[in-house]
């Protein structure tokens, strides 16, 4: 029965637009991810990025933000800090914070890319030289991907409109989608967190300040070149 459901789900996913199908798969994966598996992926990213950027001037460090994983609802509030560090000086050049959904996207991107780079380096005698030229700025390239993931907030419902409304649970939506939903519901469409009071209703995120983002659990990272202060 389980396999049948899985096959049916795959058939449905095959008919969806690629972007929507990818979103559905990421949501399903984050929903089934255990805490131990999550920690394992954080450790794996540290190992993989260290191997690919071996011999390079900069490297990335991934770590769970202290205290963000202590809640029973850790999947909603957990944050992963990604830091770019200069190996020779030890200076933190950039730091950004990701939620679980963003981290899973980055995990898939990096592990997929790294597998190709490492496979190439193991099958070609000239790979060291070629790989060095390609990955000399690998940490910076990956940090750019982190910035892209944390900067581009899309509506969690339609995956098309830009998210301009944020709930206290950190899920974000476009005005059109959330207006339709809130006509009949008083909870988050994604995690079902109840909005109990009028002042807990949909929060406009127009030109948010750093304090605003912290208050709504966005936890966006510091701008490039500024160290993260936990």
UniProtKB/Swiss-Prot annotation:
<feature type="zinc finger region" description="RING-type">
    <location>
        <begin position="155"/>
        <end position="192"/>
    </location>
</feature>
<keyword id="KW-0449">Lipoprotein</keyword>
<dbReference type="InterPro" id="IPR043400">
    <property type="entry name" value="RING-HC_RNF141"/>
</dbReference>
<dbReference type="InterPro" id="IPR001841">
    <property type="entry name" value="Znf_RING"/>
</dbReference>
<dbReference type="InterPro" id="IPR013083">
    <property type="entry name" value="Znf_RING/FYVE/PHD"/>
</dbReference>
<keyword id="KW-0472">Membrane</keyword>
<dbReference type="GO" id="GO:0004842">
    <property type="term" value="F:ubiquitin-protein transferase activity"/>
</dbReference>
<dbReference type="GO" id="GO:0016020">
    <property type="term" value="C:membrane"/>
</dbReference>
<dbReference type="Pfam" id="PF13639">
    <property type="entry name" value="zf-RING_2"/>
</dbReference>
<keyword id="KW-0862">Zinc</keyword>
<keyword id="KW-0519">Myristate</keyword>
<dbReference type="GO" id="GO:0051865">
    <property type="term" value="P:protein autoubiquitination"/>
</dbReference>
<keyword id="KW-0479">Metal-binding</keyword>
<dbReference type="InterPro" id="IPR047126">
    <property type="entry name" value="RNF141-like"/>
</dbReference>
<feature type="lipid moiety-binding region" description="N-myristoyl glycine">
    <location>
        <position position="2"/>
    </location>
</feature>
<comment type="function">
    <text>May be involved in spermatogenesis.</text>
</comment>
<dbReference type="InterPro" id="IPR017907">
    <property type="entry name" value="Znf_RING_CS"/>
</dbReference>
<keyword id="KW-0863">Zinc-finger</keyword>
<dbReference type="GO" id="GO:0008270">
    <property type="term" value="F:zinc ion binding"/>
</dbReference>
<dbReference type="GO" id="GO:0006355">
    <property type="term" value="P:regulation of DNA-templated transcription"/>
</dbReference>
<protein>
    <recommendedName>
        <fullName>RING finger protein 141</fullName>
    </recommendedName>
</protein>
């Amino acid at each position: 029965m389980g396999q049948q459901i899985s096959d049916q789900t795959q058939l449905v996913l095959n008919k969806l637009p690629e972007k929507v199908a990818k979103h559905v798969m990421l949501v399903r994966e984050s929903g089934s991810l255990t805490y131990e598996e999550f920690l394992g992926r954080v450790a794996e990213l540290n190992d993989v990025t260290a191997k690919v950027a071996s011999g390079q001037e900069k490297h990335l460090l991934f770590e769970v933000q202290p205290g963000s994983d202590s809640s029973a609802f850790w999947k909603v509030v957990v944050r992963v800090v990604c830091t770019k560090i200069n190996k020779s000086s030890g200076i933190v050049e950039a730091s950004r914070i990701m939620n679980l959904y963003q981290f899973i996207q980055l995990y898939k991107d990096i592990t997929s890319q790294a597998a190709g780079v490492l496979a190439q380096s193991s099958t070609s005698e000239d790979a060291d030289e070629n790989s060095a030229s390609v990955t000399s700025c690998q940490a910076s390239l990956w940090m750019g991907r982190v910035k892209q993931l944390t900067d581009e907030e899309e509506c969690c419902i339609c995956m098309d409109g830009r998210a301009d409304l944020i709930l206290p649970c950190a899920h974000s939506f476009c005005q059109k989608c959330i207006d339709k939903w809130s006509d009949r519901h008083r909870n988050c469409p994604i995690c079902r967190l109840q909005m109990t009071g009028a002042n807990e209703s949909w929060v406009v995120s127009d030109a948010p300040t750093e304090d605003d983002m912290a208050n709504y659990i966005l936890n966006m990272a510091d701008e490039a070149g500024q160290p993260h202060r936990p």
